[in-house]
Amino acid sequence: HTHIESSLLTPLNYAKLVVPHGTLTVLEDAHEIANVCGEEGLKYMLESNGNIPMRQLLTIPSCVPSVPNLENSGATFDYSLYRTYLEKDYVVGLGEVMDYEGVLCSDERITKILDEAKNKKVYIQGHAPLLQGNRLSAYLCNGIKSDHEARGVQEESKSIDKVLWIDIRDANTNHNMPKIIEALSEIGNL
């Protein structure tokens, strides 16, 4: 999972840098470019696929804007846009469902977007930092399959009980991968 546009590189130049290190496929969530450029940014990322030396699988950003009424964005994606884009080549699912409060409150906009993804039977990626217990269960009941925002050992073990795919990451802002892997291995059945 990556946001190529956050590297400030075009998909081609990004590929030129990562392919020599063995990265041949990335799961691109075009969230940033979609929030700034709207549908044109999304089209750009899709169209770049045939011209780069790696495979770029895309998830269509679920939250444009990230959280309605809380921030301004260059675009607003209506649920009808997903009907078309979730069927495009190289598209494998719906990107980070960040508006977890909207999901939990059955907000009409995010509910319709999730319904489109479920109707298309695509992967739905979660983004639910620190969501636990009944709130996590309610979030997952909407077809969300993973969370790439899990940050702590306690959080990871509680998520496992909910049958949630956990994306463990090591990034410049998050260096706890060894601790999380150790804690998860103690749970067993991994």
Language-model regions, residue ranges each:
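Acidic-and-aromatic substrate-binding clefts and catalytic sites of carbohydrate-active enzymes
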Residues: 7-9, 34-37, 173-174
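Di-metal (Zn2+ and/or Mg2+/Mn2+) metal-binding site signature of metallo-dependent hydrolases
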Residues: 1-15
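Short N-terminal helix-initiation segments at or just after the protein's N-terminus
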Residues: 1-5, 58-65, 129-130, 137
